[in-house]
Amino acid sequence: LAAFLTPLTAEELSECEDVISDVVREGERLIGMGADEQDRTQSIFEINLSGTGGLDGYLPVFSFSKEEKEFRGVRQMVLFRSGAPYAVLEDAAMQMFLLLNGKARQLTVNTQIEGRVVSFRTQQLQLTHTASTAGGAPHLEVCLTGKLDDVTVDGAPVADKEEAEMTREINAYLNREAEMLNQATFARGNDTFHYAWWLKLYDTAACEALLRTGTLYDIATVDFSSELKPV
């Protein structure tokens, strides 16, 4: 079973019958055939029944061209809470979401940073989680390490003298993306990245008590740090 969203109505989707085979292939890839790929490790959707009877999780959005009736793959992802969609992720945010969820191994980004068009790829990414108690409250440090490759600015390769500054800007950009994702997930009580598991490894009793009272996500803090370096 593969689950996905599309902005098309049922009638509009039926008019794209010539590309249904492409949709089926993409659905198969999303439910596990991506395991052989270098960039994805598992299916990129997750839905669970919430305590209120609605669905929690996230679903990919299959994009189509209404005019040419072409299938354009997955370009967005929607987050759900209690059956209601509340956030739409795309581009770098969607890739970061999959990375933090353990469902992607690398990033391939084309975005705007400080008014310039910046593109880059990553290699050898690794996430480390370090739990502690900061000011008496559970705290988690999430650190991303790895290599930056093929960095361009406005279509041109980065000069050696600009490499260090560009690396700092890219790391700062990824930190902002991760903070936005944290506000859209953990800070709302949606622990899609399983941060509570890491916190419980440090202090099981305290975290279990906070989970029982429903206050863990209000009290615990998460800091993300990107420390990528040039190849």
For each feature predicted by the language model, list its residue ranges.
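A glycine-rich, acidic short-motif signal
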Residues: 1-231
